[in-house]
Amino acid sequence: MTFVERIKYFLISVDFSISKSFLFSQSRFSKILKDFIYTKLYLLRNNFTIILGKSDLNDFEIPKETVFHTKYSKCYLYKECPEILKKIIKDHQNKIENYLGKNFLFEKVMYYETFNLPEILLKEDVYSNIWHMDSHDGNKLLKIFILLQDVEDNDGPFVYLDRLSTKKNWRKLVNRWTFDKKFLNYDYDEQKKFLGKKGDYLIINTSICSHRASSPKVSRKMLVIDLFPRWTKNNN
């Protein structure tokens, strides 16, 4: 590693450390600052209230092909946004625009199915099944999750904490990969499970709310879309 590379590594480490130490975030401080500036510039809301809703999936077909398949998960990436997601976005467009701004972007519309993990892998990060936050693009993003089947406790529900609960438990959540996360079982009194009927959906900012997948007894199917403000991503 050259001297310049060491300096760059140091600056990136500091960028992350500021956010972890003072902002309860796993994102880089420079990206959070950018989000803050644009939020003020466009007079957007700082907070987004988690939304739970219901949709009609009668005309939705689960894709028969996959683009990524492992022993424990598989996914299909859509080139176009499915109509069911367009309707949900339209139903909540004002709230989404007040938070992300107008002309927000979507990325990675995905059908995702997870399968049962053997006990030896439950503490390994196989398919985001340890507590984490989506830290790659600042702290302004929304994810919409739609259940493609009825989900109960043994169906591997998505598990999450709201923002206040994330802050409250930050000492244990500050890093994604740590020794104690691998060898201790951290559940939280405040955690919530996304249980429900086929077609139920959840809208949440996964960059500020800690969350994880859980292992189903057999499998669990969901449809997922990421929404970003237009200053975060190139629209291509």
Residue spans for each PLM region:
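Non-heme Fe(II)/2-oxoglutarate
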Residues: 2-14, 19, 23, 36, ...
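Active-site rim elements
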Residues: 81-86, 186-191, 212
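Conserved hydrophobic/aromatic beta-strand scaffold that supports enzyme active sites
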Residues: 48-50, 143-147, 191-193, 201-203, ...
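Conserved double-stranded beta-helix
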Residues: 92-161
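N-terminal auxiliary "cap/dimerization" subdomain that precedes the catalytic jelly-roll/cupin core
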Residues: 1-105, 196-197
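Short loop segments at secondary-structure junctions
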Residues: 54-55, 148-152, 164-165, 228-231
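A general structural signal for short secondary-structure junctions and capping/turn motifs
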Residues: 41-42, 133-138, 150, 192-195, ...
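Double-stranded beta-helix
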Residues: 153-209, 232
